[in-house]
């Protein structure tokens, strides 16, 4: 699928970083796909070969449906599943990027040319704890306005499971009390002074927006301590599967994606639904992009 990760707010989806791809179709045709102007792609589409026939069909689809796609296709960018229809209405059409969301239904990618990104010089974390999970989602737009590199959510279930594992006791010591949700906000920077300014700006904005936290924010500049925080976040999925008994969190609401401004509505609705069935759910992952893993 069109995967990405914690830093998608900086780097986008896989498709956003694909320059070109060599693909193989079910009929045996093997060829290179990449970006091009309408004239360039039309010229290639006039060739009587596998690539030409594919491009002719894609360009015909684009001409017929681009207005409908632009008008009615959901605008939120953080989708890893389903065909990337918005590729058809971008200023420069790149057919190779359609393969990133096709899950093998278009063909097989044999090789790809992709963009590279610079590894950050320094990073910092600000850990924010909330008494209510919905409150953490409501706070996310304010945090996002401070231009972090990532905002990751950990919920009470994940925290409780991690605390129960002796191997993670020291890594999770940064969490105080029993918060319903914890947001780990990461910043990139060239110097420690720059990182401190960014962290201070975030704290100022939280105070100005009157966002209620369950405890004081924690600023983490030390690389080892940051690694401990991320180790707790990454351990979550495996620990969810370690729950004993017949009832376990399962991925039935996976990769749910909506604009950050409305994500709290989804969380509130799911919380009410699972409570109605006297159950619970795990919520974690990419708050910054409006994309959570929700496992009742």
Residue ranges of predicted features:
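C-terminal substrate-recognition/cap domain of FAD-linked oxidoreductases
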Residues: 87-92, 96-296
């Amino acid at each position: 699928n069109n995967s990405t990760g914690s830093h998608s707010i900086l780097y986008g989806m896989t498709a956003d970083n694909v320059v070109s791809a060599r693909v193989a179709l079910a009929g045996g045709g093997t060829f290179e796909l990449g970006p091009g102007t309408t004239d360039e792609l039309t010229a290639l589409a006039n060739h009587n070969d596998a690539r030409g026939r594919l491009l002719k069909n894609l360009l015909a689809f684009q001409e017929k449906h681009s207005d409908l796609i632009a008008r009615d296709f959901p605008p939120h960018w953080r989708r890893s599943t389903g065909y990337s229809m918005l590729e058809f209405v971008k200023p420069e059409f790149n057919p190779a990027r359609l393969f990133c969301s096709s899950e093998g239904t278009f063909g097989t990618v044999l090789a790809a040319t992709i963009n590279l990104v610079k590894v950050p010089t320094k990073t910092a974390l600000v850990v924010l704890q909330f008494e209510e999970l919905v409150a953490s989602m409501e706070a996310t737009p304010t945090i996002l306005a401070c231009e972090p590199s990532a905002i990751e959510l950990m919920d009470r279930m994940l925290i409780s499971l991690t605390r129960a594992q002796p191997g993670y006791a020291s890594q999770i010591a940064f969490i105080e009390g029993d918060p319903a949700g914890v947001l780990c906000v990461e910043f990139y920077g060239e110097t420690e002074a720059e990182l401190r300014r960014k962290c201070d700006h975030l704290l100022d904005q939280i105070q100005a927006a009157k966002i209620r936290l369950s405890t004081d924010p924690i600023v983490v500049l030390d690389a080892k301590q940051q690694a401990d925080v991320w180790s707790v976040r990454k351990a979550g999925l495996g620990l969810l599967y370690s729950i004993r008994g017949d009832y376990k969190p399962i991925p039935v609401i996976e990769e749910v994606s909506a604009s950050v401004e409305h994500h709290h509505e989804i969380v509130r609705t799911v919380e009410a639904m699972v409570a109605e069935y006297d159950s619970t759910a795990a919520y974690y992952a990419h708050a910054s992009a409006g994309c959570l893993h929700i496992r009742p």
